[in-house]
């Protein structure tokens, strides 16, 4: 019995002493999937009962959080978003049908994040009033709180 108690205490101490994984210093954006989403595509059954949006295991960042319909870019990363450092910022730059100039939006990742390797970035509300159409070019840069670039990906047309 004494051996069992000692073994349990040792395993608890070892479990508490283990360190969590360190935040990443670089990340690869493996793929970006652009597509248009309607408001209804975000609704779940629980929202009808509670009245609050339930995002589940998704990380969704919008230019206008009160609007859901819009053009989204799903950034697929090579790491879980929880491994990104606190204060991580995603900078999105776009050429859209809305304006001739470049639009730039910064999104700060929340400190509490779902366990996923995808980030949904949405141009919503007035930032994307058209149901049809696609952005001409785009670039995403992921930076830490100090501004150091962790990863970047752009469309082919961005480089022209």
Model-derived features with residue positions:
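Bacterial Sec signal peptide processing site at the extreme N-terminus
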Residues: 14-32
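Mid-length scaffold segments of soluble, non-membrane domains
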Residues: 69-111
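A short, structured loop/turn motif at beta-sheet edges
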Residues: 98, 110-116, 144-148
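Sec-dependent bacterial lipoprotein signal peptides
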Residues: 1-16
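Short beta-strand elements
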Residues: 148-160
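Internal, hydrophobic beta-strand segments that form the core of beta-sheet-rich folds
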Residues: 134-149
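Short, solvent-exposed, Trp/other aromatic-anchored flexible loops in extracytoplasmic proteins
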Residues: 110-135
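Contiguous beta-strand segments within globular domains
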Residues: 45-80, 84-85, 118-125
